[in-house]
Amino acid sequence: MPLHFKQLGHGEPLVLLHGLFGSGDNWFGVAPKLAEKFHVLIPDLRNHGHSPHHAEMDYPLMAADVEKFFSAQKIESAHVIGHSMGGKVAMQFALDFPARVKKLVVVDMAPRAYAPAHDKIFAALLALDLKLFQTRAEIEAALASEISSLNLRRFLLKNLSRDAHGKFVWKMNLRGVAENYSRLGEVLNAGNPFAEPTLFIRGGRSDYINAADEVAIHHQFPAA
């Protein structure tokens, strides 16, 4: 699958992978700084942003998408940073295509299964009949009863776009992602350990990585 992407800077290639409900644009708070030393490439993963929609979605498929992206951009190997869902894609990519990854950084994600935590968000978004709304503010207000966080609502609504008739549509394949959501919580398909330097970063208030995860981390990523 050909992935939409943006790029900036010069130097060694650095590929940034975004999280669930996100897009490559989420990285532009830090990308310009990274671009002072690296050639930064920021793809939208399948079913997100401006990349193609597909009925199937899991980590081996997304890792294969990234490998094809490397080939299309003539990248032999690169540093890879992934956040959240993108962190799992980055880990799967490193395990499946180790020669493609020089160094790996995983932000707020461990190589284990996670219980569903976004069902309420999917239900709230899928319940919206977008053709009934004229403004983003109206949509945000309609979500407020189900999604209390203003910052989260605004993040989710970055997925809105308008079609040729000026009507709101989702850029991401919302229903497709929802139908594959259980697969996104699954444990990685582990082959041989990834032996290159790896860094795991945990948010100070996050429980996505905990002390119990260190065994699995060091088993699959011994240089972490």
Model-assigned labels for residue ranges:
Residues M1-V15, A35-F38, I75-E76, F221-A223:
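Alpha/beta-hydrolase fold catalytic core
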Residues L8, F28-A35, L41-M85:
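Active-site loop/oxyanion-hole signature of alpha/beta-hydrolase fold enzymes
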Residues G11, G19-S23, S84, G204:
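Active-site glycine-rich loops that stabilize anionic/oxyanionic intermediates
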Residues F21, L45-G49, P111:
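Alpha/beta-hydrolase active-site loop signature
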Residues M91-D96, R100-T135:
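Flexible "cap/lid" loop of the alpha/beta hydrolase fold
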Residues P116, K131-L188:
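Conserved alpha/beta-hydrolase catalytic His-Asp/Glu region
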Residues A164-F221:
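Conserved serine/cysteine hydrolase catalytic core
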